[in-house]
From Swiss-Prot:
Induction: Induced by cold and photosystem II excitation pressure by high light illumination. It is an enzyme of class 2 (transferase). GO terms for molecular function: daphnetin-8-O-methyltransferase activity; O-methyltransferase activity; protein dimerization activity; S-adenosylmethionine-dependent methyltransferase activity. The keyword Methyltransferase applies. O-methyltransferase involved in the biosynthesis of coumarins natural products such as daphnetin derivatives. Catalyzes specifically the methylation of daphnetin (7,8-dihydroxycoumarin) to produce hydrangetin (7-hydroxy-8-methoxycoumarin). Probably involved in acclimation to low temperature conditions. The keyword Methyltransferase applies. This is Daphnetin O-methyltransferase 1. InterPro entries: COMT-like, O_MeTrfase_dom, Plant_O-MeTrfase_dimerisation, SAM-dependent_MTases_sf, WH-like_DNA-bd_sf, WH_DNA-bd_sf. It comes from Secale cereale. One of its GO terms (biological process) is methylation. Pfam families: Dimerisation, Methyltransf_2. Belongs to the class I-like SAM-binding methyltransferase superfamily. Cation-independent O-methyltransferase family. COMT subfamily. SUPFAM superfamilies: S-adenosyl-L-methionine-dependent methyltransferases (SSF53335), Winged helix' DNA-binding domain (SSF46785).
Length: 355
């Protein structure tokens, strides 16, 4: 007979999708924002009233909140979970709508995209995908299930709302933590005259860095469909182009959470273009890569989340999360002479790569 711990582990692995759905429910109801508007802490009756939850459903709301507290989405006071106070914690604070703290935009779109029906259907298609042989480029699981690719026009044709959520959620996710990078990596941009921000959407990252480093001339490079929707702000320059063939020349090029979406071959093409766009190391030239660096040495919890993010890449993109050895191989193949990991910030690493 299996141990009670084995059974509990089985429950967790089999049913943990309910935690994701509970998180989605909390975002759809606006629970983080409601608690924020109530001063950051709320009783169950006050929360139910703020959300206009019928009295008949209040006990069920308490059970949902209990599950979300135990999973770390919210915090509680010393009072009992079902009848006490619920508080925002660092996770739920980044799910508050309409509040920007240290350039941390709300992550609600990221949650809603990641728990959407199309994402769930793609994940359910993994077993069938593994059984199918493929000639030529192997399609992603998402492509196999939906006959559409994320980040291009086919997703908009599949579901315009999903396409908007993915675009907004990716931008919010990728800009998360930029305040920390600016504070802790002041020397990263020190002495730079110009920088091309590669595939950075609406330029949020560049504008944030410009406030701390006004001497740097920023150019945001992205696809025409992205740049065309971005209003000129007079702070950074915007350049619409083919990401695989056009990188505006600058002293540095920054790739923030770009390469993990891409195959080895596409990474090679982009890195080669970036290398050609910068001057030598002696002239201050460098490529700044901010991306996940998979490492068991980060500890079991962080390593587990990195491997989870790698499965996300497997299902939805042609990319992967890479170890330092993988990054070294890529940089060498693209013709760079050297690199250094400046620092690791949780799952992410900040890497300088030299021509």
């Amino acid at each position: 007979m299996p141990s009670s711990q084995a059974q509990a582990d089985l429950w967790r692995h089999t049913l943990y999708y309910l935690t994701s759905m509970g998180l989605r429910c909390a975002v759809k109801l606006g629970i983080p924002t409601a608690i924020h508007n109530l001063g950051g802490v709320s009783s169950l009756p006050d929360l139910a009233a703020a959300l206009s939850i019928p009295a008949s459903k209040q006990p069920f709301l308490g059970r949902l909140m209990r599950a979300l507290v135990t999973s770390g989405v919210f915090a509680n006071g010393k009072e009992r979970l079902l009848g006490g106070l619920f508080r925002l914690n660092p996770l739920s604070r980044i799910l508050v709508e309409g509040v920007v703290a240290e350039e941390h935009h709300s992550q609600t779109s990221f949650v809603l995209a990641g728990t959407s029906r199309h994402y769930m259907e793609a994940a359910l298609g993994m077993a069938d995908w593994f059984k199918k042989d493929a000639t030529g480029p192997v399609p992603t699981v998402f492509e196999d299930v939906h006959s559409a690719s994320l980040f291009d026009e086919s997703t908009a044709a599949l579901d315009p709302e999903l396409d908007a959520l993915v675009t907004e959620g990716l931008a919010a996710h990728d800009n998360l933590g930029i305040g920390t990078i600016i504070r802790e990596f002041h020397d990263l941009f020190k002495g730079l005259v110009s920088l091309t921000d590669f595939c950075c959407g609406d330029g949020t990252t560049s504008r944030a860095i410009t406030k701390a480093h006004p001497h740097v001339k920023f150019t945001v490079l992205d696809l025409p469909k992205v740049i065309d929707k971005t209003p000129s702000d007079g702070i950074v320059n915007y350049f619409a182009g083919d990401l695989f063939h056009t990188v505006p020349k600058a002293q540095a090029v920054m790739l923030k959470l770009v390469l993990h979406h891409l195959s080895y071959e596409d990474c090679f093409k982009i890195l080669t273009q970036c290398k050609d766009a910068i001057p030598s190391r002696e002239e201050g030239g460098k490529v700044i890569v901010i991306d996940i660096v998979v490492a068991p040495s980060l500890g079991q919890v962080m390593f587990k989340e990195q491997t989870l993010m790698d499965i996300l890449m497997l299902v939805f993109t042609r990319g992967r999360q890479r170890s330092e050895n993988n990054w070294h191989e890529l940089f060498t193949k693209a013709g760079f002479s050297d690199y250094k990991i400046v620092k690791k910030l949780g799952a992410r690493g900040v890497i300088e790569v030299y021509k």
